[in-house]
Swiss-Prot record:
GO terms for cellular component: cytosol. The record marks 95 as: Transition state stabilizer. GO terms for biological process: cellular response to hydrogen peroxide; hydrogen peroxide catabolic process. It is an enzyme of class 1 (oxidoreductase). The gene is katG1. Formation of the three residue Trp-Tyr-Met cross-link is important for the catalase, but not the peroxidase activity of the enzyme. There is a cross-link at residues 98-226 (Tryptophyl-tyrosyl-methioninium (Trp-Tyr) (with M-252)). Pfam families: peroxidase. GO terms for molecular function: catalase activity; heme binding; metal ion binding. InterPro entries: Catalase_peroxidase, Haem_peroxidase, Haem_peroxidase_sf, Peroxidases_AS. This is Catalase-peroxidase 1. Belongs to the peroxidase family. Peroxidase/catalase subfamily. The keyword Heme applies.
Length: 721
């Protein structure tokens, strides 16, 4: 070997190899640039399944009975490499299901158990999810056996439900149908902290004022699911912790009764692990060595499993019989006084004073040894907070009521992000309709669509009226938790009919016209609202010299006010809508960033966003009739004028106020139009400008109309399952 060869062998043979690890991205170089990547996730390039694979159809082929039996058998099939406490994996599986579902937050519908994202960073390596990697490996033989008919997302949620059944709880039911993603989500904001479990006073704190938690977050620290089990910032104080519990659970759509039920029911079985030194634990899965094969928190200095495992640092079981569903949690919590102690790992925990020997749980590995039960600071909040205490006492005195309330709350926890009941699959789907499922009755599809369209066209409503009303009805859809959308026509009900963004006065004028047409034709109001938007677009395209038929799928139903939880729907209120060039007020986040967020929640791509904004502007759909961004002299005609004038270099753009710009002639300096940041971004951002230029081309006037119609139809049908 020559010296030259020896020297070259030490170098990376692929000169761009660093691009696969720690390269600086465009966002690093230009932090203010838009992250359009959130609009381009989970596509064919990352999904290994064929394009015609439909999980909702595939899961229907699953042998549900066999799966249930396999999971029940797995619960007591302890593995030497990660032994089950008391020979039962129930507590571990419940914690896994809970932590997968518990990331859901109502503000944007993101998080939750619906995608199997617990397999990926950052969730797979959060401190609060320590050792849940072991739970997934224990489940792997079942996933391997059932293959494509069973997603990880369904299995992770179902394992906890089966764990409860195996320990004696009558569960409320279960619905399959969660489809896996194949890489981490890029759209979820988990917080701005730069370290795990950063205290409240850290420089990037999620708190302000009197412990006001930043929206949309629903956990008190980076890396936790809900609250710190040791207390606020690790300092025990049950009443302060009660505040954190109430806020975080409310942001997951749980009331006080559901909160107590879930806290107690979650801690009725299983145990916390802290019998050792946390300093001996290796890194989390994403930081572990390659030969650890995706497992983290490994203790390579001592036994580190079973009785010697360290997870939260708290050590012990909450109840006397941790593998059996019973009312023991409240018996211990309410009948004993508790004092603060430190676990072997140094974590704060509460232990009973003068407890009877028979009330102590036995050791997980030695039935001849008993230990004190424990409570976390959150558990003590169930006793110390006056409202939680009342609920706890009722549950204590009525075990059947507690069991039913918990079963329902657990079902809600594990299904909250699945959307309407129509998406549930399997033999155990409950027949009962629940208000949080946003029920919509079946609609009529057997009516003369052309006759309805003719009545709409003759109604005297303008293109703007028709398109805007349909848009406002449909834009509430969130692909995150499948809530909102045009189905149900809730745009005519409280609270939506009164939202500022929906222009209540316009709705009060337009909706009665459409409701009368629905009554006369047998169509639902929901269908007529969407059809009106389609009619408006067809008229606008025709006025521009293009004949087009907007596709329509009938059969939407009309929800009633009784089917609508007003408070629950308040979180869907738009505080901004870049498509209609509207902001309720100025925010710290820029209007264009909010447009991206809205677009991602609606399930649209950057190209679809571009063509929709350009089309909506020329159709005259701006909120309040604003002229900002209406770059056309032919309002009401579906033309590509927005893009033509946006990209025309005979104009200059000058700021004249916050989020306001004037478009002036370079030559005369006369003001031609006004615009907002949402308009300008399509000429400023290099990617969006590329799309804008495409639609401004002389040969793409027809393509613009075709693409607008396709994107519009996607929005109108987004909630049809």
């Amino acid at each position: 070997m020559t010296q030259q060869n020896a020297h070259s062998e030490g170098k990376c043979p692929v000169m761009h190899g660093s691009m696969t690890t720690n390269n600086r991205t465009e966002k690093n170089w230009w932090p203010k640039s838009l992250n359009l990547d959130i609009l381009h996730q989970h596509d064919a390039k990352t999904n290994p399944m064929p394009s015609d694979f439909d999980y909702q159809e595939e899961v229907k082929k699953l042998d549900f009975s066999a799966l249930k039996q396999d999971l029940i058998a797995l619960m007591t099939d302890s593995q030497e490499w990660w032994p089950a406490d008391w020979g039962h994996y129930g507590g571990l599986m419940i914690r896994m299901s809970w932590h997968a579902a518990g990331t859901y937050r109502i503000a944007d519908g993101r998080g939750g158990a619906g995608t199997g994202n617990l397999r990926f960073a950052p969730l797979n390596s959060w401190p609060d999810n320590a050792n849940l990697d072991k739970a997934r490996r224990i489940l792997w033989p079942i996933k391997k056996k059932y293959g494509n008919q069973l997603s990880w997302a369904d299995l992770i949620a179902y394992a906890g439900t089966m764990a409860y059944e195996s320990m004696g709880l009558k569960t409320f039911g279960f619905g399959f149908g969660r489809e896996d993603i194949w890489h981490p989500e890029k759209d979820i904001y988990w917080g701005s902290e730069k370290e795990w479990l950063a205290p409240t006073n850290n420089p990037n704190s999620r708190y302000s004022g009197e412990r006001d938690l930043e929206n949309p977050l629903a956990a008190v620290m980076m890396g936790l699911i809900y609250v710190n089990p040791e207390g606020v910032d690790g300092q025990p104080d049950p009443l302060k912790t009660a505040h954190d519990v109430r806020v975080t659970f409310a942001r997951m759509a749980m009331n006080d009764e559901e909160t107590v039920a879930l806290t107690a029911g979650g801690h009725t079985v299983g145990k916390a692990h802290g019998n050792g030194d946390a300093a001996n634990l290796g890194p989390e899965p994403e930081g572990a060595d390659i030969h650890d094969q995706g497992l983290g928190w490994l203790n390579k200095t001592t036994r580190g499993v079973g009785n010697n495992a360290v997870t939260s640092g708290i050590e012990g079981a909450w109840t006397s019989q941790p593998t059996q569903w019973d009312n023991g949690y409240f018996h211990l919590l309410l009948n004993y006084d508790w004092e603060l102690k430190k676990s072997p790992a140094g974590a704060w925990q509460w232990e009973p004073i003068d407890i009877k020997e028979e009330d102590k749980p036995v050791d997980p590995e030695n039935p001849n040894v008993r230990h004190n039960p424990i409570m976390t600071d959150a558990d003590m909040a169930m006793k110390m907070d006056p409202e939680y205490r009342k609920i706890s006492e009722r549950f204590h005195s009525d075990p059947a009521y507690f069991a039913d309330t918990f079963a329902r709350a657990w079902f809600k926890l594990t299904h909250r992000d699945m959307g309407p009941k129509a998406r549930y699959i399997g033999p155990d789907v409950p027949q009962e309709d629940l208000i949080w499922q946003d029920p919509v009755p079946n609609g009529n599809a057997n009516y003369d669509i052309d006759a309805v369209k003719a009545k709409i066209a003759a109604s005297g409503l303008s293109v703007s009226d028709m398109v805007t009303t349909a848009w406002d009805s449909a834009r509430t859809f969130r692909q995150s938790d499948k809530r909102g959308g045009a189905n149900g026509a809730r745009v005519r009900l409280a609270p939506q009919k009164d939202w500022q963004g929906n222009e209540p006065e316009r709705l009060a004028r337009v909706l009665p016209v459409l409701e009368n047409i629905a009554k006369d034709t047998g169509a639902s109001v929901a269908d007529v609202v969407v059809l009106a938007g389609n009619v408006g677009i067809e008229q606008a395209a025709s006025a521009a010299g293009v004949n087009v038929t907007v596709p329509f799928l009938p059969g939407r139903g009309d929800a009633t006010q009784e089917m609508t939880d007003v408070e629950s729907f308040e979180v869907l209120e738009p505080l901004h809508d870049g498509y209609r060039n509207w902001l309720k007020q100025n925010y710290v986040v820029t209007p264009e960033e909010m447009l991206l967020d809205r677009t991602q929640l609606m399930g649209l791509t950057a190209a679809e966003m571009t063509v929709l904004v350009g089309g909506m502007r020329v159709l005259g759909t701006n909120h309040g009739g604003s002229k900002h961004g209406v770059f056309t002299d032919r309002v009401g005609q579906l033309t590509n004028d927005f893009f033509i004038n946006l990209t025309d270099m005979k104009y200059t753009w000058e700021p004249v106020g916050e989020n306001l710009y004037e478009i002036r002639s370079r030559r005369s300096k006369d003001v031609k139009w006004t615009a907002t940041r949402v308009d300008l971004v399509f000429g400023s951002n290099s990617i969006l400008r590329a799309y804008a230029e495409l639609y401004a081309q002389d040969d793409n006037a027809g393509k613009f109309v075709e693409d607008f119609v396709a994107a519009w139809t996607k929005v109108m049908n987004a909630d049809r399952f």
